Design a protein with these regions (language model features):
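A glycine-rich beta-to-alpha transition motif near the start of alpha/beta enzyme domains, typified by
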Residues: 1-169, 176-352
Length: 352
């Protein structure tokens, strides 16, 4: 073989959401923080993302964690997440997949019944606790960076829907949150395509109307995801609900979305719908579940916020060595928009 740009990739999924982990071939990239390293990859080494995630090797549903040396002394390892369109500063499903891969492949030592360590994401430190039995990671719980509400009960004029009420919250990524029942959606698998099309229209309208900027990082602006919320069912101190998260550039998260769960918890707490320590079970359209809770209330700069923890499971599905033959005209990666529910004006925003 005449390959170049060879990478070792472990395939994994966390509650149905594909989360590949790049464990070899990228030793380090410049940057004083993991956020700096993310920016370097985005601006100078986007070829790695394209090679691993775009066609002909990947698909629109794939995501990637690039394992890097940590810059913070408390962290054992760092990582940068990537999707087929962007570089999120935090991804809950990727943390669950990454933690599982790190322990089950021996990159980090496993201790039973519980292994704890710290990962450094571009969003900040993520404290991880894994329940381990007989060499298998049974579940991963992570403590997220602070989550908070940007906008509450805003009226938004959306093409095809008219005026709807929305909220905007941050949980590691920024979400516009919508009551699914209020716009006639039941959150059933048969609605998957419709959810994506409507979600992209809502996101487009929200970005035109509502301004957001993270209080501790002025580079984090804009609304990237849409979360449709089902009704909440309470059983004592345990609450549960279904959701559907539309990720850029218009596809459904197969899991209930870790950062989306954190954003929803922040909104529920602001509305006095959940207390610190209450259990919240989030379920996606495929029946995947994440268990979560609010650990404590904090301030994120001037912003009232909550620290959440989210727990889920992941499974390794394959071991791959990825490379490119220099004679392959399509080897660097490509994407067609037939697999995406692009919103108006969305194409120029993404990394194609």
């Amino acid at each position: 073989m005449r390959w170049k740009n060879v990478y070792q990739v472990v395939d994994c999924h966390a509650e149905g959401e594909v989360g590949k982990v790049l464990t070899g071939g990228v030793f380090d990239v410049p940057g004083e923080t993991m956020f700096d390293k993310r920016n370097f990859l985005m601006q100078h080494r986007d070829d790695i993302r394209r090679l691993c995630l775009l066609e002909p090797r990947g698909s629109v549903t794939d995501t990637l964690s690039i394992v890097l040396p940590a810059t913070h002394p408390e962290a054992q390892l760092g990582f940068v997440s990537a999707t087929t369109t962007e570089y999120p500063v935090m991804s809950g499903s990727n943390v669950i997949a990454l933690a599982t891969v790190l322990l089950e492949t021996g990159i980090l030592p496993m201790s039973e019944p519980r292994t704890e360590f710290v990962l450094e994401a571009p969003a900040g430190l993520i404290r991880v606790s894994c329940r381990c039995v007989a060499g298998k990671v049974q579940s991963v719980r992570f403590a997220n960076q602070p989550s908070f509400v940007y906008h509450s009960d805003e009226r938004l004029d959306v093409d095809g829907l008219g005026l709807i009420s929305v909220d905007v919250a941050y949980g590691g990524e920024t979400f516009v949150l919508v009551d699914a029942g209020a716009i006639g959606l039941a959150l059933e698998p048969s609605e998957a395509r419709e959810l994506c099309v409507i979600g992209e229209a809502i996101k487009c309208a929200a970005n035109k109307r509502l301004q957001v900027q993270h209080p501790m990082n002025s580079q984090l602006t804009g609304i990237g995801q849409v979360q449709f919320m089902g009704p909440v069912v309470r059983d004592g101190s345990s609450l549960s609900s279904r959701n559907a998260v539309v990720l850029s550039p218009g596809r459904l998260d197969r899991s209930p979305c870790g950062t989306g769960t954190s954003a929803r918890l922040a909104l529920m707490y602001a509305r006095n719908e959940i207390a610190v320590g209450d259990t919240f079970i989030h379920e996606s359209l495929i029946g995947a579940r994440l268990e979560s809770r609010i650990e404590r209330a904090v301030m994120e700069g001037p912003q009232p916020a909550v620290v959440t923890s989210v727990e889920g499971r992941a499974w390794i599905t394959g071991l791959h060595q990825v490379g490119m033959d220099p004679s392959d005209p399509f080897g660097a990666g490509f994407a067609l928009h037939d697999t995406h529910a692009w919103g108006p004006g969305d194409r120029g925003r993404h990394f194609f």
